[in-house]
């Protein structure tokens, strides 16, 4: 019975171990468990005196049971880490990695991938996440180590208790004492090995954490060094500026310097307080600093970081801080009232020299300077080194666009309320050149300052274009306009006659335009007339505007020549004969009469010949026996009744006229062939 109970217990334990084996374990663990179960069953059935379970199989089964309990423990730890996630989100990645490592139960190896992850956590990544991890892990490194070591010890103690309970269940009191002693020895040895392995693992993890904490502390120390260097350089520059200020200033400037020193002392105290504060208060202290301290230019940071061994880390950290503090600075600048601008709006206030050159769009640029040009030149001779000037100018010039627009709007309001003529400071030429090179916008100046700044030659050139609005300026401007207008008029006088008396157009234009619109167009007839001087007809036809240079429209012009009315009086019947012929066909107009106006008889013969040709071409149109209406026929009969019959003499005359007509026609054809 006892043997059967033992076999049943072993089978149940083996089945439970097989069923509860995690899915993530490989085939090797499953094979070991099945082999152990088969060996136990075969030994129990074959040999009664032999030990039922070998120590190797006992270790395998114990490991499988521990894995089941490890899963439950991992779930509990996951729930704990989820609660911790809500409180401390920076430990999420570390907690999840530890829980997954404990669930699998795999040994921790110092792989290069884990080292890369640690390096990326501490050196890579964005500004916010890296700073948060640095802050929170530098705050709580000891707590994490203590909690993890306590968990490891607690799990070891629980494992030892569970082993004892299993042994008590499997072997009742008073039975198999020898086997139990041997098993206890084996378990103690395995427990020692397990403890040694767990101790090694905990030591390796502790070493890694210590290395990462040391790395973070070194990085933090470097950042603090750079911040302290920058602040000390700023304070030293301000002190040297204060010491080098001339003591020739009035009492009002001295009182303003004292107030400024008090403010700078307060700023130095706040900077010392921020140095003493721990790392996790660094973000708040940064937001309380003035805007020009929070926003240093990238060029200055690169100069500081070039001498460091880890310049890339410092630059990325500064960029991340800038991104993080950008919104906080903007809100702080909006919420806090600008007392300096309110003071500057009063007439008795005069800005100190330290605030004279600020960023673009600020009111300090427009504040009146109490000193004269001689004092400025003296001060410039004793001026501090160029590096300090460039650093201060760069620091003040790198303001954000939001603050620029905000202060610019305020500045426009102050300037709109009241503006005095001497409100703009007179800048030294060297200082303004330096400011322009550094990227500042030019300050609005009076004409006197611009005259001093530019050499005489440049001012004479500018005087032609930009004159003052006084009497001399008006006279000079009118003289200048007259000088500018005179060469244009002379140019027009030179070019207009060329355009007026241009050479006569080509034969193609004359054929296309002159002969097309006027059959009596002859260039030789009026070559010396006034018509040629007024402009060519074909040029005016080609103009799209319909106007020439004098503003005369096409309709007002006379495009046709002055006709010789004496010559037309000698042709009494030409209009009656040829009254509609030129209107009907311009392209086929005869050129004989155009060329032979000197010969009256030939012109008359030519008209008669054309009349006869058209009569032959259109007999119905010229025939008297055409079809007529009844009324016209009655009138025609009356005319015939009135007409008398021709005599023989009249018939002979008509025949002679016809013969003469034929001869004249031949003569006219000969002339036309010659021409």
UniProtKB/Swiss-Prot annotation:
Superkingdom: Eukaryota
Keyword DNA repair recorded: no
Stretches the record annotates as Disordered: 64-507, 528-555, 620-646
Known tissue expression: Expressed in the brain, adrenal medulla and anterior pituitary. In the brain, localized to the hippocampal formation, the endocrine hypothalamus, the olfactory system, and in anatomically distinct structures in the pons-medulla.
Feature: compositional bias, Acidic residues: 250-269
Residue numbers carrying Arginine amide: 674
PTM sites of type Sulfotyrosine: 339, 469, 563, 622
Subcellular location: Secreted
Phosphoserine found at: 93, 99-100, 129, 147, 190, 255, 259, 291, 309, 333, 362, 372, 375, 397, 490, 529, 540, 624
Sorted UniProt keywords: Amidation, Cleavage on pair of basic residues, Disulfide bond, Glycoprotein, Phosphoprotein, Proteoglycan, Secreted, Signal, Sulfation
Pfam families in the record: Granin (PF01271)
Glycosylation site list: 93, 236
Biased composition (Basic and acidic residues): 64-90, 148-161, 168-248, 292-311, 361-410, 429-452, 637-646
Signal peptide positions on this chain: 1-20
CC per GO annotation: extracellular space; secretory granule
InterPro entries registered for this protein in UniProt: Chromogranin_AB, Chromogranin_CS, Granin
Function: Secretogranin-1 is a neuroendocrine secretory granule protein, which may be the precursor for other biologically active peptides.
PANTHER family: CHROMOGRANIN (PTHR10583), SECRETOGRANIN-1 (PTHR10583:SF4)
Subunit structure: Interacts with ITPR1 in the secretory granules.
Name of the featured protein: Secretogranin-1
Organism expressing this protein natively: Rattus norvegicus (Rat)
